[in-house]
Amino acid sequence: MQRLVLLLAISLLLYQDLPVRSEFELDRICGYGTARCRKKCRSQEYRIGRCPNTYACCLRKWDESLLNRTKP
């Protein structure tokens, strides 16, 4: 009976899709959750610093039209 419970517990743990991520992974979140770590920032992004993996921390540029909206 104990083996059955152990087998069931192990199978449930293996069934879950746990994300395995490296500390030095590309597209890691940086900048207080607002930016991404990349080897090179894209054309629509600003470089705001460095990530722990020495890649650039890239923040997406704001759309000017969204910042100047006024409600009627």
Curated annotation (Swiss-Prot):
High expression in the testis. Gastric antrum exhibited relatively high levels. A lower expression is observed in uterus and neutrophils thyroid gland, lung, and kidney. No detectable expression in other tissues tested. GO terms for cellular component: extracellular region. Keywords: Antibiotic, Antimicrobial, Defensin, Disulfide bond, Secreted, Signal. Residues 1-22 form the signal peptide. InterPro entries: Beta_defensin_dom. GO terms for molecular function: chemoattractant activity. Its main location: secreted. This is Beta-defensin 104. GO terms for biological process: cellular response to phorbol 13-acetate 12-myristate; defense response to Gram-negative bacterium; defense response to Gram-positive bacterium; innate immune response; monocyte chemotaxis; positive chemotaxis. Disulfide bonds join 30-57, 37-51, 41-58. The gene is DEFB104A. It comes from Homo sapiens (Human). Has antimicrobial activity. Synergistic effects with lysozyme and DEFB103. Belongs to the beta-defensin family. It is found in: Secreted. The keyword Secreted applies. The lineage of its organism: Eukaryota, Metazoa, Chordata, Craniata, Vertebrata. The keyword Secreted applies. Induction: Antimicrobial activity is decreased when the sodium chloride concentration is increased.
